[in-house]
Amino acid sequence: MALPMVHLLVAERWARNHPQYAQNAGFYLGAISPDAIHIRDHDDKSHKNYVHLNNWMALHPDEVIAYWRKRSAPFDIGYGIHVLTDALWVRARLEQLPQLNLPDGSLDKEKYYRDTFLTDFELYRDGGEALFRKMGEGKAPSDHPLLTQEEFAQWQHDVLKAYRGKCPKTGRAEYITCAYARRFVEECQKELDSIYGRFEK
């Protein structure tokens, strides 16, 4: 449930160790593209785990590896990095930020989305435009098994437009701050590398 700027920062950091992807626009487009399900379903999240290869809320790396073994273009590698990042993001939040849970154990969505939007837009303003330009040059595949090329392209357009505008939240991030997000970007790399290494074998 990370937002686009965090996904792009994770992808960029991961690509330092996998330089064949570092300048590939399709890889960066893939790194935001599982969330193109919102073009189809809007706020209905009933299909989100499916298009996230069963990694939306919990880590299931075998399903990403199986996907990569069928599809391994740069776009698809980025797609897999996105869904793994979401699973690791949720795990980190549950372990490190119990303050974002309501008394019944569910997520306090008001606090969560305030923080994630404020922080993601701040990260974008702090040098994110270059990554967005690179992502904006990417071309989505026409034969993806889960989402259409048109859905990917519309999501790409909508994300670019949104971040070049005004953040929908106001105030100051309290828990998911830029420091928290940047630390996550670093801390998730070892596990991402390990999973990708299993695919490469």
PLM features: what roles do these ranges have?
Residues M1-K201:
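N-terminal leader/auxiliary helical segments
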